Amino acid sequence: MAKKLYIKTFGCQMNEYDSKKMADVLRDAQHMEKTDDPAAADVILFNTCSVREKAQEKVFHDLGRVRHLKAANPDLLIGVGGCVASQEGAEIVKRAPYVDLVFGPQTLHRLPQMISTRQITGRPQVDISFPEIEKFDHLPPARTEGVTAFVSIMEGCSKYCSFCVVPYTRGEEISRPLDDILTEIAGLTNLGVKEVTLLGQNVNAYRGRMQYAEEGELADFALLLEYLHEIPGIERIRYTTSHPREFTPRLIEAYKASPKLVSHVHLPVQSGSDRILAAMKRGYTSLEYKSIIRRLRAARPDISITSDFIVGFPGETEADFEATMKLIEAVNFDGSFSFIYSSRPGTPAAGLEDTTPHQVKLERLQRLQEKVELQAQAISVRMVGTTQRVLVEGLSRKDPGELSGRTDNNRVVNFPGSPEMIGKFAELKITAALSHTLRGENVRADDAPIEPEAAIFRRYGAGPDSIGNRDNLT
C-alpha cells in the first residue's frame, strides 16, 4: 500500500508551487500519494510563510493540532518547510520535539534523503541551507492536471526592502538557465497546458544563463518572454510578482510584440508617498511608478493593473496616506492585496518607531480597499456587453452545473456550458458583473487565437481612457 502524504500550504503562489514539487519529489522517490486527511497520513508537511505577523506562532499552533497523531503513531513523520523554517531552523525542534524534519525553500528536493536519514538514525533532520539552483537540478519532470501551470523561473530577492524577510528566508536572486525553463514549458504543452504563469519573488529581475552564449551573457526577462512566445501550444503567458525597479523598456515593448502576453500586470507599489517609499527602500518614486503605468498603457491600451499596498508603515502621516490615495485615483487599479504593516523580526524596519494608533491604520486600510474595490467594480461593469476570450479551466466552484474560466485580464467568468469545453478557449459575451466574478454566455468555442487588436476593441469597445485615467499619470 502506498504511503500517504498530507501537505498544508500557507502564503504565496511560490509556496503553492513548492508544495506541488514536494509531492512530486516524494511520489517519485518513495511512491507517496497525497491525502486531504492528516489522520490518514504517514508524512505531514507544513509549508510555511513568514510575511505576515505572528507567522511563527501560527505554525506552532498547527503543529500542536497534529501532535496527538504522532503520539498515536510514532512512525508518523512531521515536517516544517518554507520561510518560517528558514528563519527558525533548529529552534522549531527545540520548541516542538516531535517534529522530524525542518527544511527551507531551497532544500525541498532533499526530502527523500532527509526522511531516510531520520528513519535510520532516529534523529530530527534540519537543512535550511541555500544551495545555488541545486533544487531545480534535482526536481522530477513537471506534472500537472488541467490547462494552466505555474513554473518557477527564479528564487529569492536581492532588493532588501526594509520591511521584508524574503532575502533572509529564500536567499538572494538566483535565476534558472533559460534552456531549462523552455524545456520544462515545452514539456507542459505535451500535457495539455495552454497557459503558463512564471513565478519569482521579483520575476522580472530574471537573468538566466543561455546555452551556447558568450561567457557572461545572460537572458533578461524580456528575452525569456520572447522565446516563450514561440513555443507551440502556449497560448497565454502570465507572471508574478514583478518589481517596478526591474520594469525595463524592453519588458514594456514586449506588450507590443507578444500577443500571448496577457493584458494584466501585478505591480506592487506599496505606497504613494515618496517619503515612505524611501523609508521602505523601494528604489523608486511615485512619479516613476506612474511613468511605468503610462508607458504600459501606451503599449497595451487595455492592460489591467493590480498592486500591493502597505498601510501604517512606521512614520506614515495622514499626508503620506493621502498621497497613496491620490496615486490610486491616478492609476485606476483593477484590484489589490492590501495589509496593515506588521513588523518582521530581523528586518531594518523592525527597529523604527511606530506611533500611529492601530484604529487609525484600520480606518486607512478600509478607505483604501473601498477605493480600489470601486475602481475594480467599475471596470467589471464596463466589460458587460463585450465579448471576451476565456480559457475554460473547469467546473464553477459555486455551481458545478456551470463552467468557469478566466479572461485575458484575469477576471473569473462563470457561464453555462458542456464539459467538452473544458481546456478550450471560448468567446463569451459578458452579461453581468458581480462583486468578484463575471457572468457570461457562450458565443463560440474553439482553439483559434483571436487577433489581439480586435480583442482590444471587442473587450472594451473604447479607447484607453475607458480603462485607466492616463491623463492623470503625470
From Swiss-Prot:
The keyword Iron-sulfur applies. It holds the Pfam family TRAM. Its cofactor is [4Fe-4S] cluster. [4Fe-4S] cluster 1 binds at residues 12, 49, 83. Residues 381-444 form the TRAM domain. It comes from the Bacteria. It is an enzyme of class 2 (transferase). GO terms for molecular function: 4 iron, 4 sulfur cluster binding; metal ion binding; N6-isopentenyladenosine methylthiotransferase activity. [4Fe-4S] cluster 2 binds at residues 157, 161, 164. Residues 143-382 form the Radical SAM core domain. It catalyses: N(6)-dimethylallyladenosine(37) in tRNA + (sulfur carrier)-SH + AH2 + 2 S-adenosyl-L-methionine = 2-methylsulfanyl-N(6)-dimethylallyladenosine(37) in tRNA + (sulfur carrier)-H + 5'-deoxyadenosine + L-methionine + A + S-adenosyl-L-homocysteine + 2 H(+). Keywords: 4Fe-4S, Cytoplasm, Iron, Iron-sulfur, Metal-binding, S-adenosyl-L-methionine, Transferase, tRNA processing. Residues 3-120 form the MTTase N-terminal domain. Binds 2 [4Fe-4S] clusters. One cluster is coordinated with 3 cysteines and an exchangeable S-adenosyl-L-methionine. SUPFAM superfamilies: Radical SAM enzymes. It is found in: Cytoplasm. GO terms for cellular component: cytosol. Catalyzes the methylthiolation of N6-(dimethylallyl)adenosine (i(6)A), leading to the formation of 2-methylthio-N6-(dimethylallyl)adenosine (ms(2)i(6)A) at position 37 in tRNAs that read codons beginning with uridine. Monomer. Belongs to the methylthiotransferase family. MiaB subfamily. This is tRNA-2-methylthio-N(6)-dimethylallyladenosine synthase.
